[in-house]
From Swiss-Prot:
It comes from the Bacteria. This is Enolase-phosphatase E1. Keywords: Amino-acid biosynthesis, Hydrolase, Magnesium, Metal-binding, Methionine biosynthesis. Belongs to the HAD-like hydrolase superfamily. MasA/MtnC family.
Length: 234
C-alpha cells in the first residue's frame, strides 16, 4: 500500500491505535466504578446536569427515575455505558473521570506497539497526524499522553470528536478536511469500522481498515486492509 501521496493521516483510536479490550475492559469499567463518587462530589456543572437529565427523559431505552440526585445521574450514565452509547455528555463525564485516574496513576493507556514508530515516520516525512474519535478531545489527549510508550501527544496536529458530527456521517469528514485546510483527497483515515470508512470515502477521503487482534469482523468492503502500520512509509 503506497501512502506517500497523502499529507494528513487521520487516526481512529479504539481498534486502530489502541486495543478494543483496553477501552471496554479497563476504561469503561473504571468510569462505571467512579460515577457514584463523581456525582456525589458535585464536580459536574449545573448546565451539564440539566443536559444529562434532558437526554435521559428523551431516552426511550431508559425507564429509571431521573433527577439531579447523584444516584439517579450515576445510574443513567451506567445505562449509557451498557449500550455503548456515543453520548457527548457521557463522553465529557468519562473524560473527567479518566483524567483523574491517569493523573493519580490508576490508569495507563495501552497502545499497539507499531503506533509510536509510525507516528515518528509521519513526523520525519514532514506530514501531519490527527485524531478523530467518539471519545471527547480531552479523553483522546489523555490516552496518548499517558500511554505505555510515554507521551505521544506531540505527534498530533489536531484532535476531533463528535463535535464535528458522528463518525458514520460523511459531513463530519468534510468538516475535518475544511478545518485542517487540506483537500480531502490528501487525507488517509485509519479505522476499524467499515461504515466509518464508507462515510469518509463519501467525503472524498481515502480509508484503510485495521484488522487488529480483538477487532470485530467487518462486512465485505473495497477499502485498503492492513493488520499493522509496520512497513508503511508516509
Amino acid at each position: 500500500m503506497n501512502i506517500k501521496t497523502f499529507e494528513f493521516y487521520l487516526f481512529d483510536i479504539e481498534g486502530t491505535t489502541t486495543p478494543i479490550e483496553f477501552v471496554h475492559k479497563i476504561l469503561f469499567p473504571y468510569s462505571v466504578e467512579k460515577f457514584d463518587s463523581f456525582f456525589q462530589s458535585n464536580l459536574l456543572e449545573k448546565e451539564w446536569i440539566e443536559k444529562l437529565i434532558l437526554e435521559g427523559k428523551n431516552d426511550t431505552t431508559y425507564s429509571g427515575k431521573l433527577s439531579d440526585s447523584a444516584f439517579d445521574l450515576s445510574e443513567y450514565c451506567k445505562h449509557l455505558v451498557s449500550l455503548d452509547r456515543k453520548s457527548g455528555i457521557l463522553k465529557e463525564i468519562q473524560g473527567r473521570i479518566w483524567k483523574s485516574g491517569y493523573e493519580n496513576g490508576e490508569l495507563k493507556s495501552s497502545m499497539f506497539s507499531d503506533v509510536p514508530s509510525f507516528l515518528k515516520k509521519i513526523q520525519a516525512s514532514k506530514k501531519k497526524s490527527a485524531v478523530y474519535s467518539s471519545g471527547s478531545i480531552q479523553a483522546q489527549k489523555l490516552i496518548f499522553e499517558y500511554s505505555d510508550f510515554g507521551n505521544l501527544t506531540h505527534f498530533f496536529y489536531a484532535y476531533f470528536d463528535t463535535g464535528v458530527g458522528g463518525k458514520r456521517e460523511s459531513s463530519s469528514y468534510s468538516k475535518i478536511s475544511e478545518q485542517l485546510g487540506v483537500a480531502p483527497e490528501k487525507i488517509l483515515f485509519f479505522t476499524d469500522i467499515k461504515e466509518e470508512a464508507d462515510a469518509a470515502k463519501e467525503a472524498k477521503l481515502h480509508s484503510a481498515i485495521l484488522e487488529r487482534p480483538g477487532n470485530y469482523p467487518q462486512p465485505q468492503h473495497s477499502h485498503f486492509k492492513i493488520s499493522s502500520f509496520e512497513g508503511l512509509n508516509p
